[in-house]
Every structure is written in C-alpha cells, then in structure tokens.
Amino acid sequence: MSEVPVARVWLVLLLLTVQVGVTAGAPWQCAPCSAEKLALCPPVSASCSEVTRSAGCGCCPMCALPLGAACGVATARCARGLSCRALPGEQQPLHALTRGQGACVQESDASAPHAAEAGSPESPESTEITEEELLDNFHLMAPSEEDHSILWDAISTYDGSKALHVTNIKKWKEPCRIELYRVVESLAKAQETSGEEISKFYLPNCNKNGFYHSRQCETSMDGEAGLCWCVYPWNGKRIPGSPEIRGDPNCQIYFNVQN
C-alpha cells in the first residue's frame, strides 16, 4: 500500500474539524456560551483586581493573570499591559502555549526583538525556520482586551507577515517542521474564507531537531480535551496498534514494541 503524504493526512483532519459558521467575515469565533454553561461558572474572587475571560473559548469570567504567571491558549488572559509569550529558550513555543506553559510578560518586552544569539549567524540563503521564529513572526501574544485567543492572533497575522522570507520549504529536511509550517499556512488561508469556524485543530508537536515527538494531540477550543495518538518520530505516521484517546496514550510502550 502506498504511503499517504503527511500534508494530505493533515488536510483530511482539518476538513473534518472545520464547520461552516453563520457569521460571514468572522471565521475564528468561539461557540456561543449557553445559559447552562454560564450557570456552572464559579464566582470570581472578590480580591481580583481585573476580571477577564479565558483566552480560549471558555465561557467563565476569570481573574486576569499577573506578571510572571503561567499562561496559554486555555488559561485566563494576562492583565492589561501584559502579553503571553513562550519562555526564553523554549524549544517548542507553539506547543508550549497550547499547553499553558507560557508566561505573562510586559508588552514592551514581548514586542522587543530578540537579542542576537551567540555564535555564527545563519546564511542569508538558508530557508530553515525554527518554531521560535514562527512564534516571533506570528506575534503569539494577546492583550487581555482582545476577543481572540493567543493562537488565533498568531494565525490572523500570519498572512500579512513579510518577515518570514521563506522561499522554498521543499529544501527543508525536517518533516515535522515542514508540516507545522503548512498547518499554520493552511489555517491562515482558511481564515480568508468567510463563514468558517474551527473549534479543533492539530499543531504538530516537533522536537528541537524538527522531527516528531511520539505523542501528538489535537488542540480543542470548545473546552473538551483533544484526542492524542502515537506516531513514529521520523515520519509522523501512526504507530499500528496504538490508541487514540483523550489523555496520555503511553506512546513509549507502543514505540518499544514496534522496535
């Protein structure tokens, strides 16, 4: 049986999770908050100095996060004047933010260009791009007054970003990094199509070398935990016999069995 290209597999997954919305021109909208959902919200502490809602599609008001607090797609928003960013040196910034492993920093610090790294600069002809560069160019940060989540801010600014200077991703050798770029590119293009509403999506979980972590999970914006599954690190294809569950599928067990 011939192998199905990874990009095609992702396209199928995206089509399965895209639903046609009813509001033209607003493709990145969360599902409406029903009275039942709002009734289940816990009260906000009286000591809270700034009330906001969660950064994802949660319905409950939350206390805005202070400077230095952990943050991400599904957490409360950072307080006014702060932005949620991946920690310095984070090898998987996009994935870290979907897991709530970012931190609230001053907006001035978040928008400042990174200091040059020690060592030799990359060749100007290089078409390599790291996940950290993706984070910087997609501006993965959201002030507390924004209506969209951190991740939607990233996707909405992607198409207009001219800082990537990517000329030919076919020259890239890292399969997960290639898929990550294509996923975000496809989501950005989907935003241009009015009426689309995405509540679940998949961002490849890449290691620092651009290959796949054995556990891959979808990200859910509807409050429900996303599905996780196991893949081979070198090509991202499902490990036969491994489960697809909402939780930890213990991929190392299945990986060891296959090897």
Swiss-Prot record:
It is found in: Secreted. Residues 1-25 form the signal peptide. It holds the Pfam family IGFBP. GO terms for cellular component: endoplasmic reticulum lumen; extracellular region; extracellular space; Golgi apparatus. Residues 173-251 form the Thyroglobulin type-1 domain. GO terms for molecular function: insulin-like growth factor binding; insulin-like growth factor I binding; insulin-like growth factor II binding; signaling receptor binding. One of its GO terms (biological process) is positive regulation of cell growth. Phosphorylated; probably by casein kinase II. Phosphorylation alters the affinity of the protein for IGFs. In amniotic fluid, the unmodified protein is the most abundant form, while mono-, bi-, tri- and tetraphosphorylated forms are present in decreasing amounts. The phosphorylation state may influence the propensity to proteolysis. The modification Phosphoserine is found at residues 45, 120, 123, 126, 144, 156, 194, 199, 242. Residues 26-107 form the IGFBP N-terminal domain. Keywords: Disulfide bond, Growth factor binding, Phosphoprotein, Secreted, Signal. The modification Phosphotyrosine is found at residue 158. Changing residue 246 to W: Loss of binding to ITGA5. Disulfide bonds join 30-57, 33-59, 41-60, 48-63, 71-84, 78-104, 176-206, 217-228, 230-251. The keyword Membrane does not apply. CDD domains: TY (cd00191). Gene3D superfamilies: 4.10.40.20, Thyroglobulin type-1 (4.10.800.10). A motif (Cell attachment site) lies at residues 246-248. The modification Phosphothreonine is found at residues 157, 193. Binds equally well IGF1 and IGF2. Interacts with integrin ITGA5:ITGB1. Interacts with VHL; this interaction inhibits HIF1A degradation. Multifunctional protein that plays a critical role in regulating the availability of IGFs such as IGF1 and IGF2 to their receptors and thereby regulates IGF-mediated cellular processes including cell migration, proliferation, differentiation or apoptosis in a cell-type specific manner. Also plays a positive role in cell migration by interacting with integrin ITGA5:ITGB1 through its RGD motif. Mechanistically, binding to integrins leads to activation of focal adhesion kinase/PTK2 and stimulation of the mitogen-activated protein kinase (MAPK) pathway. This is Insulin-like growth factor-binding protein 1. The lineage of its organism: Eukaryota, Metazoa, Chordata, Craniata, Vertebrata. The gene is IGFBP1.
